[in-house]
Amino acid sequence: MMKVVFMGTPDFSVPVLRRLIEDGYDVVGVVTQPDRPVGRKKVLTPTPVKVEAEKHGIPVVQPLKIREKDEYEKVLALEPDLIVTAAFGQIVPNEILEAPKYGCINVHASLLPELRGGAPIHYAIMEGKEKTGITIMYMVEKLDAGDILTQVEVEIEERETTGSLFDKLSEAGAHLLSKTVPLLIQGKLEPIKQSEAEVTFAYNIKREQEIIDWTKTGEEVYNHIRGLNPWPVAYTTLAGQVIKVWWGEKVSITEKAEPGTIVALEEDGFVVATGNETGVKITELQPSGKKRMSCSQFLRGTKPEIGTKLGENA
């Protein structure tokens, strides 16, 4: 039986690991990030992949830095025929990449060469794409730059969020891997080099990228809100207080107003001017230190005036 090592960390990776087990491969080890403190109480919490591996009695390796010799040698000691990675979260060294008979392959959540990096799902929505997908490719030391083995497209719906697309792509990745591994073993795949001219990047989201830029078009603001839902969540400021914006709707506005200005108060939300004639009606938000709520709930306690400017001192 072929021995496989799986490397992954978040929820996205779990269906991929599960599919390898269901397909009957001998998963001899799982490599995942170390347990981390989570929440206000800083409770030391295992990764979703570690939890899944332990359910199946699979040995778990948790390197702080996989590139260090004493760490990668633990992986080599498992003598895998194939290594599969999916959102592992560290650059894997050549010593590991060159060891398995069938190589090291990665399940990546974009149609490479577009959106290399750690946040391809966020960026696909933030950039207003109508489709994205899964790429399975050989791993190299350079970020997401290996030769492509297989791809599948996934449609992005008008009201898609990063959360819903994350789930769709995770399942699509597991399904594509199930079809790819047998073809790889049989030598039936022709690897395709990525076009460097078409490369774009989706680096991990930084705090300053979470701020809503109201000078952008209404469509761009709407995509920004969707792309950061449910994490890390877009935000703006109202009367100097941070407000997380969980959801908004695109609406046509006729009023001429500076971007970021509240131009209408409605029962289910307030309409904010943007950089074009498409405004955004905020319908779900979370004031600083409070729970997520509908905008209608918020408006029962707080009534901002028309003409109030959002995003000042953000």
UniProtKB/Swiss-Prot annotation:
By its UniProt entry, which PROSITE patterns does this protein fall under?
GART
Cross-referenced InterPro entries: Fmt (IPR005794), Formyl_trans_C (IPR005793), Formyl_trans_C_sf (IPR037022), Formyl_transf_N (IPR002376), Formyl_transf_N_sf (IPR036477), Formyl_transferase-like_C_sf (IPR011034), GART_AS (IPR001555), Met-tRNA-FMT_C (IPR044135)
Note the Gene3D superfamilies from the entry: Formyl transferase, C-terminal domain, Formyl transferase, N-terminal domain
The residues the record assigns to binding (6S)-5,6,7,8-tetrahydrofolate are: S110, L111, L112, P113
Please tell me one Gene Ontology term that the record gives under cellular component.
Answer: cytosol
Taken from the record, one Pfam family name reads: Formyl_trans_C
Q: Which SUPFAM superfamilies match?
A: FMT C-terminal domain-like, Formyltransferase
Q: Which GO terms describe its molecular function?
A: methionyl-tRNA formyltransferase activity
Can the keyword Transferase be found in this entry's annotation?
yes
EC numbers listed for it are 2.1.2.9
Catalyzed reactions per annotation: L-methionyl-tRNA(fMet) + (6R)-10-formyltetrahydrofolate = N-formyl-L-methionyl-tRNA(fMet) + (6S)-5,6,7,8-tetrahydrofolate + H(+)
Name the protein family. Answer: Belongs to the Fmt family.
Q: Which PANTHER family match?
A: METHIONYL-TRNA FORMYLTRANSFERASE, METHIONYL-TRNA FORMYLTRANSFERASE, MITOCHONDRIAL
What does this chain do? Attaches a formyl group to the free amino group of methionyl-tRNA(fMet). The formyl group appears to play a dual role in the initiator identity of N-formylmethionyl-tRNA by promoting its recognition by IF2 and preventing the misappropriation of this tRNA by the elongation apparatus.
| Protein name per the record | Methionyl-tRNA formyltransferase
Q: Which organism is it from?
A: Bacillus mycoides (strain KBAB4) (Bacillus weihenstephanensis)
